[in-house]
Amino acid sequence: MGSTRTPPTTHLALPFFDAVHRDLGKRLAAWMAAQQVDESDDRKACREWVRRLGDSQWLRYCVPAGDQGALGGALATLDSRALVIVRETLAFYSPLADFSFAMQGLGSGAITLAGTPAQQATYLPLVASGKKIAAFALSEADAGSDAGALQTRATHSGGIWTINGSKTWISNGGIADFYVTFAKTDPALGVRGITAFIIDADTEGLDSSEHIAVMAPHPLATLRFSDCRLTADRQLGALHGGFKLAMQTLDIFRASVAGAAVGMARRALAEAVSFSKQRQMFGQTLADFQLTQAKIGEMAALIDAGALLTYRAAWLRDESQRTQSSEHDDALGRSERTVAAAMAKMTATENAQRVIDMALQLHGGMGVKVGSKIESLYRDIRSVRIYEGATEVQQLIIGKAVLR
């Protein structure tokens, strides 16, 4: 953010990308280099990032264009490679800017996938312009990785849905204008008894005031629903189709989480290279030591490994959109795409953690100084290994697929 560091662009020449993606990456990097946002107050900063990203039309990559551009998107469909490029570039400069962008996409993704034309027209253009802040409310205190165990209830009577329960670890909690919320509509059916709803922030009975402080500050809150009454048009997608919709939404954005991790890792490497070339010790620079060169080489390889898996996962999804075939072929393709996204998310986030830790070690004491870029990256990367599917969940997805 406002940094003299610039992200590399040579990877944009890889065959995963086309001219649109290459232009996007270069334009966004130039724009981000000029931005200065005070991030000392994470809620205020996120609102500011959403405003800027919306005003400058970057949020248009969070939603599809719709007929004649009516939904406000930049491209005809949600493009996974564009999402990866945007998140990688934003995260290189500011993980909080990346968070602000990502939650607009995740929070509105289910509306893109399953919303009625009226729901899409009501919400998606305002998400794309930054006029409304979106949130995705799935997790609960006892239902994180085991999302199917959620206990929030939705009961139906006389054409009205009544929501009771709570959600926690909700990104954009307390600042969002609406929450795509998942609730049990038939507990006896387990995961097949979950339905999604769109709940506006000003709905009576919704309390989002319980903020959660974490090691890398960003807006998180617990939501409490006390007899929240919703009209029938608040239901999102099919009755009892909520769990499938939640998983489809997460699948779309999983590769982009990996992209964000790659961006943070690239920034850590840039910081380490710059510092090692300047730091003098024992009559030479830190970069002159073979041990430093070995560490830098390992960091670069770790980044590329994660990046290539990430770009492959995004490309596979985009190709499936372009070449839709038979239902049988699509089922096989879905499995392949899910595994590819899991590999990308697992590898990119775990490798980014290693790269940032190695970069911090090269900085010595300066690496743990509060306020330094490496110190903040060290805090920022940790949660990325957990949210939208922890590393262990990705390992299970991959392992089960290999054993089939």
Regions found by a protein language model. Give the residues of each.
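Alpha-helical interface subdomain recognition
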Residues: M1-F92, A114-P117, L126, G130, ...
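Short Ser/Thr-interspersed hydrophobic loop/turn segments at strand-loop and sheet-helix junctions
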Residues: Q57, V86-A91, A183, I199-E204, ...
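N-terminal glycine-rich flavin-associated loop
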Residues: P95-A118, G144-A147
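Short Gly/Pro-enriched turn/cap motifs at secondary-structure boundaries
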Residues: S100, D142-S145, W169-N172, D186-A188, ...
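A gly/ser-rich beta-alpha-beta helix-loop segment of oxidoreductase catalytic cores
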Residues: I133-T155
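Flexible, small-/acidic-enriched active-site or ligand-binding loops
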Residues: A149, D202-T231
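A short core secondary-structure module
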Residues: N164-L206
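A short, charged helix-loop
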Residues: A221-Q248
